[in-house]
Structures are given as C-alpha cells and as structure tokens.
Amino acid sequence: MKILAVDTTSTTFTAVLIDGDKTFAKSFEVGKSGHSSLILPTIADLLAEGGVEVKDLDGIAVVVGPGSFTGIRIGVSAVTAIAYGTGAKRIAVNSFELLAYSRESGVLAIDAGHGHTYTAKLENGKIVSTEFVEEKDSATLPKDKITTTSCSVVTALDNIVRTKWAENNFVKVFEPYYMRKSQAERNNEI
C-alpha cells in the first residue's frame, strides 16, 4: 500500500507518504500564500525520499476542508490530477477529523479568516454538528472547551488515512468542503 496524503487547508502545509508500515512526511509553515509554489516540489521530494514513483501510488488522500479557500482548491486540484494520472484510489479527509483525532468530546475550532471561526461539536469521538461563527458571535463560544490543535497533523493524517484505506472508505471525486461562500461570491450578492 502506497498512499500520498496532502493537507493545504491551513497555514501549515503537510504531505505524508505511506508505504506499508513506513511513513515519510514533510510539514512546515507556509503562511497564507505558499502552498501553490511548494506543493508539487514537496510531493516530488517526498516521493523521492520514500523511493516511490508517482505511477506506483495505490491511493491519494487530501484534506478537503474546511479551511483556506485557496488552500483547499490547491490541494484538491493537485491530488485530483495525480489521481487521474495514476488511477489511484481517492480518500477524502475532513479538517475536523484531524482535530478530532484521539479526542472524545469538545468544540473543535478552525480559523476561518477575518476573525471568523469554523466550529464542530464532538461527542463520543463523533462530529455531531458544524457551524460557521462570525466574528461578532465568537464571544459566545465556550473558550474552556475549544480545541484548536490536535496531536501532530502528520500523526493524525497518517492514522486517519490508514484507517480509511483499511475500511475501503474511498470517494469517486474529491469535493471541497466549504462552510461559507467565497469572498467573490459574497461580493456578488451586494
């Protein structure tokens, strides 16, 4: 089993290569605009480090959101092209799954930009609801119960992808998960 997994939904870029029981990973801060220039060279470096050629990938995974609109589009587009070219099986991962990894309950929060927040309620290890919280309403969030970080994103992504692979939890098409309209869509409504 050779699987490439990518997360471009936040200011941290993460790429993981799973090859049987081995894991190779690269994860670093890129800010708000570094994903597009780094994704393909980083994937190439990671594959070279693992001694795996693109054509040998059995699976490809991507975090589909929520998160940065541009980041989501970059990650989904890049891995979709690879999946089409290789015929690799596709695994979609939700950003909240990464935050929920190894947790049982609480409120998960992701920076939505401009002071807004994407939230999810976690009960018994399952996400039971999600919500987009505007800046003006963020004061109502239960600060003492909010989780904004998980264990290592590499660890969470590695384990979630391995589990989905074992469960044959594949998708035909990567669907970006946006919890709100893009800035351009919101501007067109004015």
Predicted regions and their residues:
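N-terminal beta-alpha supersecondary unit
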Residues: 1-59, 132-133
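Oxyanion-binding and handling regions
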Residues: 1-18, 22, 91-190
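Glycine-rich, flexible loop/turn motifs
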Residues: 24, 65-68, 72, 170, ...
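A general structural signal for well-ordered alpha-helical segments in protein cores
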Residues: 36, 40, 79, 154-158
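Phosphate-handling active-site elements
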Residues: 50-55, 84-93
